[in-house]
Regions:
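HhH-family (HhH-GPD) DNA N-glycosylase catalytic core used in base-excision repair
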Residues: 1-236
């Protein structure tokens, strides 16, 4: 099954450019079709007239109109004012604190998931939307899958509880129908999956892709859940 992030220009996995490619669009990955976002990101990167939006130093020198036009061209930015502002803020942070290279953020935090999350959340105004619990955890997961960055403490990457993951969790019986109305439903689902995999060889984020695809495909695949299995006792 093809994932949204598979739409990429095939850059060297350990390169600065590759790490930036999988970072900047992620901050705009909310309330939209992820496949279309990454298709737009790839088209933007491969167009010589727009590729410089992936260069933080170039972005900080662009006028508001220049950045907006580049991001809107292939619809990386769906909100023509807000989305370019988010993109510019992230680029400014990368330039001011990490010499325009997102890899330096990981180095500064010893490639530790726990430290990286603590740093970004502690400086959330510098990382608009990327610092949110859903996007932050999923971004870290994507970085482990599509870049050469080797993160320590992978178990601290929690399930990224978007609509599909929540629906799949309910389908499995991990949460009840009435739980959907909880104000903290995302945090609740994330915590339950942490409990399910506590002290096992698996990490919570390992179930994100299967759950996401299962829900997105309308639960076409039939899955039998052994509700006596100790892995599910904490959540049921």
């Amino acid at each position: 099954e093809v994932m949204p992030e598979d739409a990429n220009p095939g850059l060297s996995k350990d390169s600065k450019e590759n790490c930036l490619y999988f970072t900047l669009p992620m901050a705009l990955n909310y309330q939209r079709n992820s496949y279309k976002l990454w298709e737009a990101a790839k088209a933007t990167y491969e167009d010589v007239e727009t590729t410089d939006v992936f260069d933080p130093k170039a972005v900080t020198q662009m006028s508001e109109g220049e950045l907006k036009n580049r991001l809107v061209k292939y619809k990386v930015a769906l909100q023509p004012n807000k989305h370019p502002e988010i993109w510019r803020k992230l680029c400014a942070t990368l330039c001011d604190d990490f010499d325009g290279d997102i890899r330096n953020l990981f180095i500064k935090n010893d490639n530790s998931v726990e430290k990286i999350k603590e740093y970004i959340v502690g400086n959330k105004k510098k990382f608009p939307y990327l610092s949110g619990p859903k996007i932050l955890n999923y971004w870290l997961y994507v970085m482990t899958q599509y870049t050469a960055i080797d993160l320590a403490g992978r178990e601290y990457i929690t399930v990224a509880p978007d609509t599909h993951v929540i629906q799949a969790s309910m389908k499995l019986g991990l949460i009840k129908d009435e739980d959907k109305s909880r104000a903290d439903i995302r945090e609740y689902v994330s915590t339950l999956w942490e409990e399910v995999f506590y002290d096992t060889e698996y990490c919570p984020i390992d179930v994100h892709t299967p759950l996401w695809l299962w829900s997105r495909n309308g639960f076409a695949a039939q899955i039998e859940v052994d509700k006596d299995n100790e892995l599910f006792q904490s959540g049921l």
